[in-house]
Design a protein with these regions (language model features):
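Short, surface-exposed acidic/glycine-rich loop or hinge patches that mediate macromolecular interfaces
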Residues: 21, 47, 137-138
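Charged helix-capping and loop-helix junction motifs
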Residues: 24-27, 144-146
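Conserved strand-to-helix beginnings and helix N-cap segments that scaffold or border functional pockets
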Residues: 20-21, 54, 141-144
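Short loop/turn segments at strand-loop or loop-helix junctions that form parts
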Residues: 7-12, 71-73, 124
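Asp-based phosphoryl-transfer active-site loop
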Residues: 2-21
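Active-site phosphate-binding/coordination module
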Residues: 26-122
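Conserved acidic, metal-coordinating active-site core of Asp-based
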Residues: 105-161
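A general structural motif
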Residues: 2-4, 39, 65, 127
Length: 161
């Protein structure tokens, strides 16, 4: 059996432009040639949700990955040769265990009285990702500390990003 090479890369400002920085000339072409090797297993690791990953692949002509770790690490997909995306449910269960089997909604209730938090849009959430905005000028450190304390008091293992 030939050796395999797992190649994991971010998308934004790594493979594709995002913001004012220009894209590196020829980078996508070189990358595409590299991942054509059948020994390469390609994974995109991104904060993007599935739809945004699919849009980026289409818009920039990126190679179809074998895996996507998306939504800031809260989802893992295996992409089949047919193009079907298969959610890794064992990863969801692992996070669920870390959350003491509490749901996204349960955590929303748990954090509802903390500072100036405002829930982000529905498309920026998933069953294991809870995203908020906080008011400009608010004490981000104090808010983060309050969230961490509240989660820890419930035995919830989570990381604030």
């Amino acid at each position: 059996m030939p050796e395999r090479l797992l190649l994991c890369t971010d998308l934004d400002r790594t493979l594709i432009p995002n913001g004012p920085q220009p894209e590196s000339p020829g980078a996508r072409e070189i990358f595409a040639a590299l991942v054509k090797d059948t020994r390469v297993v390609l994974a995109y690791v991104t904060g993007r949700h599935r739809q945004l990953v699919e849009e980026a692949v289409e818009q920039y002509g990126l190679p179809q990955p074998d895996f996507v770790i998306g939504d800031v690490g809260t989802t893992i997909y295996r992409i089949e040769r047919s193009g079907n995306w298969r959610l890794d449910t064992s990863w969801d269960k692992q996070i669920g265990s870390d959350w003491n089997d509490m749901s996204n909604r349960d955590l929303q209730g748990l954090l509802s009285d903390i500072g100036t938090l405002r829930l982000q849009e529905t498309h920026k959430q998933n069953s294991r990702k809870l995203s908020y905005y906080h008011a400009l000028g608010s004490d981000r450190g104090a808010i983060s500390s309050a969230i961490e304390t509240r989660l820890q008091s419930q035995g919830i293992k989570a990381r604030l990003v």
